[in-house]
Amino acid sequence: MADMRTLKLELLVLFAAVIAVNAFAQDGDGPIEQAQSLIRRTEGKVFRDAVTPHWLREGKSFWYRVSTAPDKHEFVHVDAVSGAVRRAGSLKELGLPEEEAVSTSAQRSLKPLRTRVNGEATTLRVRNSTADSVELYWVNQSGERRSYGRVRAGDTKELSTYAGHVWLLTDSLGSPLGFFETPPTGLEIEADGKPSQSDPDIKRESEEKSEEPKQPGRSPDGKWSIRFENHNAMLVTNEGTAKEGTSTPLTTDGTELHPYRGPIFWNDNSKHCVVLRVKNVPRREVTIVTSSPRDQLQPKLIKYDYFKPGDELPQGQPVLVSVADKSAKVISNELFPNPFTESGHIDIRWSPRCDEFTFDYNQRGHQIYRILAVNAASGAVRKVIEESSPTFIEWNDKTWRRWLDDTNELLWMSERDGWAHLWLYDAATGSVKNQVTRGEWVVRRVLKVNEKDRCVWFLAGGVRSGDDPYYHHLCRVNFDGSGFIRLTEGDGDHAIEFSPHEDFFIDRWSRVDHPTVTELRLCADGRLVCQLERADIALLLESGWKLPERFVAKGRDGKTGIHGILIKPTHFDPQKKYPVVEEVYAGPHGSFTPKSFSRLMRQHVLAELGFIIVQADGMGTDERGKQFHDVCWKRLEDAGFPDRIAWIKAAAESRPWMDLTRVGIYGGSAGGQSAMRALIDHHDFYKVAVADCGCHDNRMDKIWWNEQWLGWPLNESYLRSSNVEHAGRMHGNLLLIVGELDTNVDPASTMQVVNALQKAGKSFDFMPLINTGHGAAETPYGTRLRMEYLTRHLLMPTSRSSQVRSN
């Protein structure tokens, strides 16, 4: 056995050396270098595309600086009321101070709640300098917390993330230490026990109203505190009271496995608070090895908390504390018996009247979602809202709400009619007052709510007839469903920025084949005040860069439109035939085909080698109707392949230069899983795949993402979706890439599919990247490997790389 292990290791090392030589043993001006030079050749060739308004204090005018040509720019002053525009070479010429004595855009105080999912890959590093453990949470698109585990005292945790992702750090009792938004350059946080100066706008919409900072555990009137000792809760009288320092036990049955703990949620009249009782469970730890640490010779072992599908989870119950009675009542969990939570945390919200508190119940398996209310006097629990689905409720993105305290109402997002829409509830009775938005289109994101005028502003998709249904448009509607108006016009994807007083908005719209147009419009009716800029891409086109081509074809059902793009090389010749390479990411949590204007360098550089690059969103992805989305339910192996293959074939019918005898595919993470799956289920169509950091068996991946789509308890759907289970059916040329330090997808997922391929006697290529995390194929080394591999097998099909072979 020892000899066999040695032989396999030698084969792997030999392969790694050979493929590295193949990848880099090229002249400095070879095809890959020439393709990558497109980045340099197209840089700085787009002008008048970026407008950053600096509003003057009266809120009726602003200025901006815009690039007009290489190394040239101009300053522009805009009178928002009249639409008059003045242009000059300096602020002084415009009669404005050189220093920015102006307020910044209101967009900065209306920062979107949802974490951006399309930011570039980067890293997050958390160093815990406190004497106790801290907890790290990702704040998802709707403001919900998702635990990424503890960081023990003195430890450091590093993980892969994306620019724009929002993270929350709490102490061991759950008290927030700070919210943090990840910049493209990465983020390093040191937990020192002090509250951070975080942006107050990065939080859920229901918490928009600012509060004065309070001492953790202390009641608003300062008379009482809650303290936890030996896993139990104590009520403490504070300084200045008649019984200063007196402690009264509230509970006595707390244990290490079933402790009472924070956070502590006081109501405003200081008569009641809520703490939590939690059922702790052993946390799964994933172990990875840093084979080549930068600070020592010997490898390092890294462990981190990581729940996987099917794991036992902690559970929390609210505990209602009465100051008058000095009592604690554990709230019955009859209406929330099996919550999905990775930490046992429950977010509590007290009503302004202090007579009840509310919290969410997300049933494990994600087929029931409730907002529950608890009476402060009796502890009785009632339903405010209940959603149910035979497939899944997308609790990350589609459980937005806004409490309307003055009228005791609640705005709520639901897909109950098959589309993501807003509903108005009577919060006191839990009854629907009316549907606010309706139609065969979706609410993508709520931007603001005006309680005084009883209207809501939101971005919608599919609301403009004839448009790509993924394009965002700004809309407004009254709470009672009347007065609906679409405020944007251009045929493209719209990004919105409001003026400080919210009477104007700047609309930036574009398409992949239409450069950005920036307009100033009135909030009242969307009327155009003036066009500010139209991006100039003349020099970009002179470089040879070609506009992507949009294309729509019917999906598997022969009825539903599938939207995608095609990208050609600069040297494109319609008389030639080109192999087709698909970039795939079919994760059900979003849609991923680019919609707005960008140079799209990853795709264009790859096309430059002599490929036609295609991207499309098939059924099972998000941001269309519920029926479209539900295709993914317990069928992640489907990944929209029937729709995208039909789309590619339809495109080729009118494009004879697409050679469908040479089709490749690549993707990372969920896209890596799909890329390999192409050679398992669709190897009659796809011939080559590059699969990076794939979640090749969903039982090995993070719990929240996989149970959302495959459900709980685990059943045969997990086996159907597993590339490991079906590795023996793989045919074609496969390159597997993984970063040895991936903390997003357990790298063992890739190693296990390697093992399965070896056992099945399959030939394939495998490259682990050392000291690299998630998204290894997007590193310079990984990117080049991908380019070289696709070139070899699609442009030079008779050449074969060294392969890992196993019998």
Where are these regions (language model features)?
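Serine-hydrolase catalytic core recognition
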Residues: 53, 347, 354, 360, ...
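A flexible loop/linker signature enriched in serine peptidases of the S9 family
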Residues: 66-72, 223-234, 250-261, 276-316, ...
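Structured interaction patches on ligand/partner-binding surfaces of diverse proteins
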Residues: 172-197, 289, 296
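Blade-terminus and WD-like Trp-Asp/Gly-His loop motifs, strongest in beta-propeller folds
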Residues: 54-60, 216-224, 263-272, 347-357, ...
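Asparagine-centered strand-capping/turn motif at beta-strand->loop junctions
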Residues: 124-130
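Alpha/beta-hydrolase-fold serine-hydrolase catalytic core, especially in secreted/extracellular enzymes
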Residues: 45, 58, 70, 83, ...
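Short glycine-/Asp-/Thr-/Trp-enriched loop segments that recur within the blades
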Residues: 45-47, 98, 210, 254-261, ...
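Predominantly five- to eight-bladed beta-propeller fold
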Residues: 81-102, 247-265, 275-333, 524-538, ...
